[in-house]
Curated annotation (Swiss-Prot):
One of its GO terms (molecular function) is ATP binding. Part of the ABC transporter complex MetNIQ involved in methionine import. Responsible for energy coupling to the transport system. Coiled coil: none annotated. Keywords: Amino-acid transport, ATP-binding, Cell membrane, Membrane, Nucleotide-binding, Translocase, Transport. The complex is composed of two ATP-binding proteins (MetN), two transmembrane proteins (MetI) and a solute-binding protein (MetQ). This is Methionine import ATP-binding protein MetN 2. ATP binds at G38, F39, S40, G41, A42, G43, K44, S45. Belongs to the ABC transporter superfamily. Methionine importer (TC 3.A.1.24) family. The keyword Cell membrane applies. It catalyses: L-methionine(out) + ATP + H2O = L-methionine(in) + ADP + phosphate + H(+); D-methionine(out) + ATP + H2O = D-methionine(in) + ADP + phosphate + H(+). GO terms for cellular component: plasma membrane. Signal peptide: none annotated.
Amino acid sequence: MIELKEVVKEYRTKNKEVLAVDHVNLSIRAGSIYGVIGFSGAGKSTLIRMFNHLEAPTSGEVIIDGDHIGQLSKNGLRAKRQKVSMIFQHFNLLWSRTVLKNIMFPLEIAGVPRRRAKQKALELVELVGLKGREKAYPSELSGGQKQRVGIARALANDPTVLLCDEATSALDPQTTDEILDLLLKIREQQNLTIVLITHEMHVIRRICDEVAVMESGKVIEHGPVTQVFENPQHTVTKRFVKEDLNDDFETSLTELEPLEKYAYIVRLVFAGSTTTEPIVSSLSTAYDIKINILEANIKNTKNGTVGFLVLHIPYISSVDFGKFEKELIERQVKMEVLRHG
């Protein structure tokens, strides 16, 4: 269990004070994958570096498995960092060491006997899919392979928490998915708690259980990924979801001719089992109306499917539209009116 209570981080410069993290409260379940998303400058990197005290909070508490991180002694903090490990965007490998020796490095620092350290490193090489590359140097590896070494090294001391600081940002889409699949496998095998920060909604959607959205140092929205993706509340969250959907439909709406009276353009959002139900055809029959599908999209999250439909209804009376909306609510389908005549 990880708890952040009223965490604040301020930086003082010559001319002003910068509030990088602004009274953040979070509760992260043990064994879950928790994502923090935000644009550049939102404060997410500063936030994650306070989990293992690479940054000290100006005020507030960071509590991991009952330990108040800011109250630990030097030796206590050193021991805790072995259990709260971290991987980085640019891998941070030792270029003069082979794959195997990079993975052995934290074990050497921890005083593990060489034979045991080597055996552990070989097991991790196999876990992350690098068997046969033990003697390769970082300069001989692809970006995805380097990140696999980084992950193996981070797992060397059997951590309970893995922090991922933009771990896939330097990778191409296919390699990103491979690394995300590896993180999922590791979480399941080792019951890790994973906290990752990113600016990509695809990453959040693919592996996270819950997400917090940051802007200007504040958490502006948080909750289960499916819920946040299905019903974003804040402008920033809506922008992330829109980018993930590649949705430029609202822009093209302005180019449409004015609608006739009693005509509507609506967006429906489906989740779970409703994504496979023939709702549009049944409503079209029930209300004897024509429904044109202007746009459709389905996205898979780790915990379920979310579907999006944009519909054009050429004519429906106000009374029937009210019934139409009520029936959608009963079927747990969300509706947003984009335009009406």
